[in-house]
């Protein structure tokens, strides 16, 4: 199995390319328009709308939906596309800070899709340190209180990213982690942030800022992790992504998505077995899910998500609402 080629014949903008437009929008708005038209609210609104058009704010999201739906309808591997949608939903990002316009599409295309050919651990690691997820969960605002920077600052930790990594992305609350575990996980993640500058603002590349990282060892769910800078996070992710509770949580969620809202142990067990035998290889896990879905489909009914249902109907009956690629060309002027 290989990464499925895109069926979209038009331009597919890169994450960095779109981020440059996002940077232009933020900088022009904050540093120029607000100052220039501070006494003329109507003119400011008018110029801001022109800036949105110039930087593709309303174009990128529509373009990404066209790429996504074209892929689902026309791909020669619809099952692969279904799994792509599943993982995009599992590692979802919010609608805040213009992320849908400037981040969601390339995040799903460049981070989630390629890692579907790797292990679950690989995917968790790459998602966790992606620009989209770091910004979605405000990890750039998380500063270790005893870090070189934090010890002389009033800034402190932000638990959002650590809590979501534990609760929604890996082991789930069923593992029984405590608030102390969340705090320790947050300490591990301090320092992972966008590289801020006067020109790039919050659109800089992700890096590990040791000056913001909480020093010393951390204890998470009873295990001590030695101080190891940026490698600390990868070590913890390795344990979380291969934890029995994580396997059970993800396998259950996969079966719930593809088979029934109430998956049984006999449905879930083969998926966990495939996980164990393959070291978490997602292609192997996906095959196990498909086998279970095929075996139990005649005895179970599953109400599809609206988007999934419409896309399936489009494939079955040969209709499409997706604009042709040449009609999605955009003039950034």
Where are the regions a protein language model picked out?
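His/Asp/Glu-rich metal/cofactor-coordinating catalytic motifs and the adjacent surface-exposed loops
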Residues: 4-52, 103-109, 113-333
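Structured, charged N-terminal subsegments at the starts of enzyme catalytic cores
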Residues: 49-56, 60-81, 85
